[in-house]
């Protein structure tokens, strides 16, 4: 079935949710097998061949950010240039791996469904990839490009645009919408479809900064990737928010200390990662007041999947794998965090709709029939 006039649509990916490319001209390398210089850009994310033992040392060194406490900004190591390919196109968010291996399939199912309904890739459905290692305060050029693209798409389509965001992309979208005047939003945004949003932050990020997280890839040591994961400012930005979670909830337990949302400064000191607290202070205010977006919101979230909500560490804290305390959610985003969008009900004149997706895992919800059917309903509605 073809649509008469397509509602232009932008896909905003989440953390790790689009390709990154790198070009090297480094003064030194961490291992003799690492490339020191490349003639052109190559895929840094996602390239599974770079994530094998030994090669991962090179990957970590190229992927990491260096935080500058004076400028409150982060940058790549000397001789490493990172770029985000495919802004305004869909390929970079459809497949994270350019070889289109199924392991890296991301927005493909949604985009392909839209093509089947009469959409055209890179025309009335486009991707808005960004450097997801950073928080919005360091991606100002991205938001200017996003605003310009939305305006162009709306003018061409003859009506406002729908934004479909996943995971951390929802916080990016919220930040973006909070920066726009209401008149702009009324003119250019029809709906904001939110998939698997970590509105109140996620407990999982605590494990990432404390002991690293290999995402269940057995050949990768969590401690080996920890330095890179800590350096990504967006990781610290996604720690649980004090205005969303109970103040007395213990997220991290060691033989000597319990850490709640009010104890993050001490936590950063105890794991010897003082820069992390500075990053948190830089980024926590960006969306912490949870100002309503001022557009129609459709908040789809997974539930019924075991999701980490606290961690217990032995006396070897922080250099040891924790015992995981499980709760409800989508396997990544805690249910408590996902439903925070209900706080907007009645706080903006535009409708806020919540849809629970039982047994839906965080990334799998992008290929779920219910999700795709819901998107179709929104795009088809007048």
Where are these regions (language model features)?
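Glycine-rich, aromatic-lined ligand/substrate-binding cores of catalytic
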Residues: 233-316
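N-terminal non-catalytic accessory region
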Residues: 1-164, 168-229, 239-240, 246-255, ...
């Amino acid at each position: 079935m073809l649509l008469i006039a397509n509602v232009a649509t932008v896909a905003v990916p989440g953390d790790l949710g689009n390709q990154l490319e790198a070009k090297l001209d480094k003064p030194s390398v961490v291992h003799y097998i690492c490339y020191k210089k490349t003639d052109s850009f190559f895929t840094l994310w996602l390239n599974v061949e770079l994530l094998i033992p030994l090669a991962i040392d090179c990957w970590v060194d190229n992927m990491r950010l260096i935080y500058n406490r004076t400028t409150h900004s982060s940058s790549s190591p000397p001789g490493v240039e990172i770029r985000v390919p495919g802004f305004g196109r869909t390929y970079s968010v459809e497949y994270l791996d350019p070889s289109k291996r199924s392991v890296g399939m991301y927005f493909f199912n949604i985009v392909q469904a839209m093509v089947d309904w009469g959409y055209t890739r890179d025309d009335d459905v486009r991707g808005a990839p960004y450097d997801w290692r950073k928080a919005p305060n360091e991606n100002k050029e991205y938001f200017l490009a996003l605003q310009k693209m939305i305006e162009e798409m709306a003018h061409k389509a003859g009506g406002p645009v729908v934004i479909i965001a996943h995971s951390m992309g929802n916080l990016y979208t919220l930040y973006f919408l909070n920066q726009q005047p209401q008149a702009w939003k009324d003119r250019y945004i029809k709906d904001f479809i939110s998939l698997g949003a970590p509105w109140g932050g996620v407990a999982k990020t605590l494990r990432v900064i404390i002991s690293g997280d290999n995402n269940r890839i057995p050949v990768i040591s969590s401690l080996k990737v920890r330095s890179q994961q800590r350096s990504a400012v967006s990781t610290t930005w996604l720690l649980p928010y004090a205005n969303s979670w109970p103040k007395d909830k213990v997220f991290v337990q060691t033989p000597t200390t319990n850490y709640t949302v009010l104890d993050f400064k001490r936590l950063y000191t105890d794991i010897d990662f003082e820069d992390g607290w500075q990053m948190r202070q830089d980024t926590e205010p960006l969306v912490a007041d949870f100002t309503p977006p001022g557009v129609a919101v459709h908040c789809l979230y997974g539930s019924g999947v075991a999701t980490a909500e606290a961690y217990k560490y032995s006396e070897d804290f922080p250099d040891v794998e924790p015992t995981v305390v499980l709760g409800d959610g989508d396997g990544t985003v805690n249910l408590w965090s996902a439903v925070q969008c209900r706080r907007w009900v009645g706080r903006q004149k535009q409708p806020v709709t919540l849809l629970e997706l039982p047994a839906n895992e965080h990334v799998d919800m992008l290929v779920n029939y219910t999700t795709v059917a819901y998107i179709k309903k929104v795009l088809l509605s007048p």
